[in-house]
Amino acid sequence: MSIKFRTVITTAGAAKLAAATAPGRRKVGITTMAVGDGGGKLPVPDAGQTGLIHEVWRHALNKISQDKRNSNYIIAELVIPPEVGGFWMRELGLYDDAGTLIAVANMAESYKPALAEGSGRWQTCRMVIIVSSVASVELTIDTTTVMATQDYVDDKIAEHEQSRRHPDASLTAKGFTQLSSATNSTSETLAATPKAVKAAYDLANGKYTAQDATTARKGLVQLSSATNSTSETLAATPKAVKTVMDETNKKAPLNSPALTGTPTTPTARQGTNNTQIANTAFVMAAIAALVDSSPDALNTLNELAAALGNDPNFATTMTNALAGKQPKDATLTALAGLATAADRFPYFTGNDVASLATLTKVGRDILAKSTVAAVIEYLGLQETVNRAGNAVQKNGDTLSGGLTFENDSILAWIRNTDWAKIGFKNDADGDTDSYMWFETGDNGNEYFKWRSRQSTTTKDLMTLKWDALNILVNAVINGCFGVGTTNALGGSSIVLGDNDTGFKQNGDGILDVYANSQRVFRFQNGVAIAFKNIQAGDSKKFSLSSSNTSTKNITFNLWGASTRPVVAELGDEAGWHFYSQRNTDNSVIFAVNGQMQPSNWGNFDSRYVKDVRLGTRVVQLMARGGRYEKAGHTITGLRIIGEVDGDDEAIFRPIQKYINGTWYNVAQV
C-alpha cells in the first residue's frame, strides 16, 4: 500500500535548519502550527510550499519536544479548544517565529465542529519532523499558552513516580520523613517508630509519684466548690465561679448605676455642698429652711395669686386682653391740635401733620351726595363717562368691532430709530396699483417674523429678512413653483432659473427630471430610470445607454460577503454572465459563466500548454553503480543483456509540452 499521509520539510525550512547547525548561528524557533482544509480536497505536501493551500486556523504550539525513542525526531503539538471549529482539517503547517513555513503535512480528513453547531471537543494535532541535529531547533515555548494533554499528564506522573523529587514532611505539610526510636528527642522533622512509642507507653503505665501543687510550683491539686474558703491548696470549680458571678451581676455598677426598688442613702447635714447623693429628707429640710427665711415674700405672692383668681394661665390671659387695645399714636394728637371753624375741612399735609382747608358750596354739595352716580350727574360728566366706556384705552384694550382707516393711513410702532409700519396704497378709485405694505427699520437688522402661540408654547413659522425668506414649518403650494422665473412645466413642478428645466411629479410615486422640456430621468418605486444616456466625464466620456431592444433586463451588482469581500457582477434575469472578485487574501479573480471567445488567441497560445507528449527515444548504456535519468526525461524501457558490465540499455524519452506552436522539453528541479 502506498503512503497517503506524510510530512515534508519545506525548502525554506531545510535552509534554515541547515544554517542553524553552523557554530554561533541562531536556532530555529518553531512556535506556531496552522491547520487548513486543503481547498476542499486532500492535498499532497510539496517542499516548495510557503503556506497552506487554504488555512482556516492557527495558534501557538502547546508543546514541542524531542522524541524519547528517536533522538532526531521533533514532536510539535497543537491543541484546538471546543469553542473553535466549523471547518475541515486536511493539512498542517509548522511556522517559526519569523513566519516561515518550516514543514507541511497532510492528514486524514476530519471535521472540527464548533460549540454553536451543537457539538464540541478538544482536538490535539501532532507533527513529527526528522532533523539531522536537534540542537538546531529551539525546544522552548511560551508556557502561558500550554495546556496539558492526557499523554503529557500520564508521562509526567510516571516520571514523578520513578523520581525522588518529593518534599519532606513538616508540621504544616505532608511529605517524606525519617524514622527515629529516640524517646528524648526534640526534633520536629523525625517520625517516632513503634519502638519509641512502646517505650513511652511503658513509662506512662507505671505509678505516678508527682507532688502536690502549691502557690510556688506546679503539681496535683484538689477541686472545691466552696465560695467562702481561704484555702491556698484547693482549686475553684466552675460551679464556685458561677455562684460568685451570679452574686456580682446583682450589684449595681460603680459608673452610672441604674437602681431599682427603693434605695436608701445617708442623710447629709444641712449646708452640705458637694457631689454626695441627696435623699428626700435632706431636700425637704432645705425647702423648709428656705420658707422660714422669708415669710413676708411668700405671703405677698399668696395674696397676689388670690387677687388674680389663682389663674394658672395668667401670662396668656394678660396678652389676650392687651391685643384689642388701640396703640398710642401721633395721628390723634395731630387732629386734636386743629382749631374748629365753619366751612373748614381737615386734611394731612405730611406724616402725622394735619391742616384745614376752606370748604366751598360745591364741596359741600359733593360731600352730601350718597353715590358716585349722583356726583357724576351733579358735575355734568355723564356723556363723557358714556363715551369713555366704549373707548380704546391708551394702555391697551380689546376691540369687539371693526376698525376702519380712511385714505392712505399708516399703523406704526416706533421706538427711537426702530419702527414697524403697516400701510395701504391706493391713489384713486379704480387704481390698478393698490396694495398693502409692511415696513420695518432697524439699521439693516430688520426682519419680519411670523409666529404662532398655543397655550404657553410659541413657535416661529416664517422669517423674512432683507435678503432671505426662511419658512420654518411645512409648506404646501397648490400649483407649480418657479425659482427665478415663471413655470412652464405646469402641474406639481418646480423649475430652476429656466422655465422648462426642473422637477415634476407625474403620478403616484413618480418624480421626473426635465431639461429644456425633455424628460431625462425618472425616480419610481425605488428605481432610478434614465431616458437618455448616462455620461461620466466631459471630454473623455464614459457613457451607459440602452437601445431598448434586449429581451431581458441587465443588472450590474456590487456586493460582498465574509469569504468574498468585493464582487462586481454582471447578469440578466436568467443568471450571471461574469464577475470580478477580490478574495480575503487581497488577490483578484475573474470568472465567466460560460466560454470565453477572444478574437485573437495569440495571448492564450503563448502562455498556456495545449498538449503534452513523450519525445524521441534516447538510449544510454548503464555502467556498474547505476545511472540517473537525463534531465526532463523519463525511463520508458530497460534492455538487460547481463553478459558484461556496461552493455545494458536504458531507454528514455523527453517529456514535452506544446506552447504557441512549439514543442518544449520540460525542465527538471
Swiss-Prot record:
Q: Give one Pfam hit by family name.
A: Phage_tail_fib
Which family does the similarity line name? Answer: Belongs to the tail fiber family.
What positions belong to coiled-coil segments? none
- Record bears the keyword Ribonucleoprotein: no
> Does the record bear Iron-sulfur in its keywords?
no
Which cellular component appears as one GO term in the record?
Answer: virus tail, fiber
Q: What's the protein name?
A: Probable tail fiber protein
Q: Which domain of life is it from?
A: Viruses
* Keywords tagged on the record: Host-virus interaction, Late protein, Viral attachment to host cell, Viral tail fiber protein, Viral tail protein, Virion, Virus entry into host cell
Q: Which organism is it from?
A: Escherichia phage P2
Q: Which InterPro entries match?
A: Gp34_trimer (IPR048390), Phage_lambda_Stf-r2 (IPR005068), Phage_Tail_Fiber_Structural (IPR051934), Phage_tail_fibre_N (IPR022225)
Q: Where in the cell is it found?
A: Virion
Instruction: Output the GO biological process annotations, alphabetical, semicolon-separated.
Output: symbiont entry into host cell; virion attachment to host cell
Residue segments, region Disordered: 251-272
